[in-house]
Structure formats: structure tokens, C-alpha cells
């Protein structure tokens, strides 16, 4: 699963996801993509599950690009532990996804296969998404 090799600090503030995506809103690599429509934290496990669903539907043809990276450590305290005594330990990694952000791109397959593959991948994600495609020049 995806996670940073090294970070400056072990724990981060929770933060909020305000506004829309500043960058990464257009297709850069592939012909088809999956764009987020709402703000949400997407975990590394969810990204991996979506990637597997997409590649399985494409039958290992074409190419998949993951345009988001889980760089936010999410902490959790153990179950049945009283409040207080500091912050919990990092449990998993998540990516903050803004509305308008392209999360996945694919290329090298037909449009109907791409549409179905991204639909199956979107089912694994906690955000509403939209299928986008490059405008033919």
C-alpha cells in the first residue's frame, strides 16, 4: 500500500478540507479519468482496492495512473481506553481529496471498458465521482 517513506513529524492535525482542488483537475496522462465531486479523506487501503478493481476489469491491458497519494497520518487510540493521556498512535495513511481532483487516469483501452472499470473503482471509494475523458483534438 502507498505511504510516505519518511516524514518530518509522526503525527499531524486532523485539519479540514475547504474549497476546491487547486491543481490536478485535468487529465495529464491518460484518455479517461475519475474525478472527485466532494471533499473526503481517502485511505491507502481504499486507493489500493480501487486500483485492483480497475486493473482487473481492464484485464491487465492499458495503463493506470494514481493521481492522489496518502500523505496524512491518521491516529487512533486503542479500544476501551479512557479519554486523555495524549494522542493515539498512527494507524493508517490517508489522502485529502478536494472536489474537482482527478484521482485515477487510464489509457490503452476502449471507452466502454474504461467506463466500466472506473465505475467499479469508484464503488470502492468514499466520494461521489464523475467519469471524464479527453476531448478529441
From Swiss-Prot:
Keywords from the named record: Ribonucleoprotein, Ribosomal protein, RNA-binding, rRNA-binding, tRNA-binding
Membrane-spanning residues: none
SUPFAM superfamilies: Ribosomal protein L16p/L10e
GO (cellular component) term, any one: cytosolic large ribosomal subunit
Top-level taxon in the UniProt lineage: Bacteria
Swiss-Prot/TrEMBL GO biological process terms: translation
Single GO molecular function: rRNA binding
Cross-referenced Pfam families: Ribosomal_L16
PANTHER family found in the cross-reference section: 50S/60S RIBOSOMAL PROTEIN L16, LARGE RIBOSOMAL SUBUNIT PROTEIN UL16M
Complex formation: Part of the 50S ribosomal subunit.
Described purpose of this protein according to its UniProt entry: Binds 23S rRNA and is also seen to make contacts with the A and possibly P site tRNAs.
Family: Belongs to the universal ribosomal protein uL16 family.
Protein name: Large ribosomal subunit protein uL16
Provenance organism: Methylobacterium sp. (strain 4-46)
Amino acid at each position: 500500500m502507498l505511504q510516505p517513506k519518511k516524514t518530518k513529524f509522526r503525527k499531524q492535525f486532523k485539519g479540514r478540507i475547504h474549497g476546491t482542488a487547486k491543481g490536478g483537475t485535468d487529465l495529464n496522462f491518460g484518455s479517461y479519468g475519475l474525478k472527485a465531486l466532494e471533499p473526503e479523506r481517502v485511505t491507502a487501503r481504499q486507493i489500493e482496492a480501487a486500483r485492483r478493481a480497475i486493473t482487473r476489469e481492464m484485464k491487465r491491458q492499458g495503463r493506470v495512473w494514481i493521481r492522489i497519494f496518502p500523505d496524512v497520518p491518521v491516529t487512533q487510540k486503542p479500544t476501551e481506553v479512557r479519554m486523555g493521556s495524549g494522542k493515539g498512535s498512527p494507524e493508517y495513511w490517508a489522502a485529502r481529496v478536494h472536489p474537482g481532483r482527478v484521482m485515477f487516469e487510464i489509457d490503452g483501452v476502449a471507452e466502454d471498458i474504461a467506463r466500466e472499470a472506473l465505475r467499479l473503482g469508484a464503488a470502492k471509494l468514499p466520494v461521489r465521482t464523475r467519469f471524464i475523458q479527453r476531448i478529441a483534438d
